[in-house]
């Protein structure tokens, strides 16, 4: 909301989006993606089989190496920022000052990679120790501190600091990363895993746990980064979209970015949360060769993800334009921007369940010591995404919305493929029960969609439609799911209540 009010959907925000996405790709390579996927299973196995002292040593060595590796990547990113911008958004040269602004902002924001990579390692340590509170809310702190500090530096006190609003927001991203790390460190120490930095590289590489993490991280960097690579492919196409007169458009990159922010909310609350909570249990089952428990935990978690994300996707599609208008349509963000962003959000929502399942299923392979399978599927998804995006732009006329739809199709393809491939590894995934559950959830979500449409028609205002439509949609889904006897409903209700802070 703050960014839309300050920058709208034009050249400045296009530059900001691209400048953020390149270091965010590196973040996905080292932080929430590859590092978490490799570190949590290895740390859990070490804690389970070798004890707390060895796990503490592994945590200290890992933190030291993460600092060195991400520090080196940050330095390279700052030096080669012009090359990255030219590679992923060559169309920026056609708008005076847009290319130079993107380079400057990227150089400012790249250091947040170091903080967030260390924060991801701290989060993995806490999850493996069954300490979910601070670790679960720390990503939200990143967003809050980034916005508030950015506003303070570039807007509220811009005259005193000499910073423009967009530069202030870029610096705020780095401060937010430091806050996400800092808030978790006391909990890490209380858990008994306080970091003891170890800088002897040769000795560090002799540690079995470190070698196992590095062995998993190579393919995992490709596997987990595929989503961000696909986003960059989408950005490349969007940055080159032209209007009827043949001029490069200002707006498509911003519309997709604003839509993805809304899309990421249920993805983070439900998909990432369920995956993060389930992964330590799955890792322990794999370490103990208890594949019956592994299979049950995985199947139950996938069902939970579907139960929460399918109705969320329907809600985004039905109420997307109202929500975007209410939150974003201020200052330089106009009604036309609201409409274009809502189109992209609807297309992203199609793939919400696929995106969320991927957050669980790819790391599940790493707990089995198999990093090759998700890597190969990810490589295939990058190719499929590029071809699908090209087809959408060239033949459908959907523009930026077609790019969002291509991304959704690819995420669903990847999730389904990985689910099929993991079946023989663990003796099945309770596929029949999972399919029946998915059909029931889809039917209940369809009922919810009809009710939401009716409620929206009776209350045409943005606020009125949302205040009446969302509760009506939730109630209708719950009643339909109860009537269809969806087994995961009770557990999902407890999760939602907990995430809303209504119980400890």
Task: Locate each region found by the language model.
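Membrane-embedded alpha-helical bundles of multi-pass transporters/translocases
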Residues: 1-504
């Amino acid at each position: 909301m703050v960014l839309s009010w300050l920058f709208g959907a034009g050249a400045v925000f296009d530059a900001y989006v691209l400048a953020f996405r390149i270091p965010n790709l590196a973040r996905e390579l080292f932080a929430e993606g590859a590092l978490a996927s490799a570190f949590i299973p290895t740390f859990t196995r070490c804690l389970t089989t070798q004890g707390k002292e060895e796990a503490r040593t592994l945590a200290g060595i890992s933190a030291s190496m993460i600092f060195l590796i991400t520090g080196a990547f940050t330095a390279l990113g700052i030096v080669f920022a012009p090359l990255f911008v030219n590679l992923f958004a060559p169309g920026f040269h056609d708008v005076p000052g847009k290319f130079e602004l993107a380079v400057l902002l990227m150089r400012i924001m790249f250091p947040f990679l170091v903080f967030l990579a260390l924060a991801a390692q701290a989060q993995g340590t806490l999850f493996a120790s069954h300490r979910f509170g601070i670790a679960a809310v720390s990503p939200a702190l990143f967003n809050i501190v980034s916005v508030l500090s950015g506003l303070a530096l570039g807007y509220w006190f811009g005259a005193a600091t000499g910073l423009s609003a967009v530069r202030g927001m870029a610096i705020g991203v780095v401060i937010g990363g430091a806050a996400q790390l800092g808030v978790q460190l006391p909990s890490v120490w209380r858990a008994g895993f306080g970091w003891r930095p170890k800088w002897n590289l040769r000795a560090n590489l002799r540690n079995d746990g470190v070698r196992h993490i590095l062995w998993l991280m190579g393919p995992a960097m490709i596997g987990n980064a595929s989503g961000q690579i696909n986003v960059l492919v989408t950005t490349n196409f969007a940055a080159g979209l032209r209007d009827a007169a043949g001029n490069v458009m200002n707006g498509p990159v911003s519309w997709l970015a604003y839509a993805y922010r809304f899309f990421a909310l249920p993805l983070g609350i439900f998909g990432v949360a369920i995956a993060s909570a389930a992964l330590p249990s799955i890792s322990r089952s794999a370490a103990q060769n208890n594949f019956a428990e592994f299979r049950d935990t995985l199947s139950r978690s996938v069902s939970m993800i579907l139960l929460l994300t399918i109705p969320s996707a329907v809600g985004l599609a039905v109420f997307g334009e109202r929500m975007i208008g209410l939150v974003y349509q201020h200052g330089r963000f106009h009604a036309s921007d609201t409409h274009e962003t809502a189109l992209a959000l609807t297309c992203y929502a199609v793939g919400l369940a696929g995106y969320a399942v991927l957050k669980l299923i790819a790391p599940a392979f790493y707990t089995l010591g198999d990093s090759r399978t998700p890597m190969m599927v990810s490589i295939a998804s990058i190719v499929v995404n590029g071809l699908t995006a090209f087809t959408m732009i060239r033949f459908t006329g959907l523009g930026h919305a077609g790019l969002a739809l291509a991304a959704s199709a690819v995420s669903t393809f990847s999730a389904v493929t990985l689910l099929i491939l993991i079946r023989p590894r663990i003796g099945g995934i309770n596929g029949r029960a999972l399919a029946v559950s998915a059909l029931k959830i889809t039917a209940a979500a369809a009922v919810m969609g009809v009710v939401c449409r009716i409620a929206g028609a009776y209350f045409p205002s943005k606020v009125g439609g949302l205040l009446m439509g969302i509760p009506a949609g939730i109630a209708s889904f719950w009643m339909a799911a109860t009537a269809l006897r969806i087994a995961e409903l009770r557990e999902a209700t407890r999760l939602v209540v907990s995430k809303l802070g209504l119980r400890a």
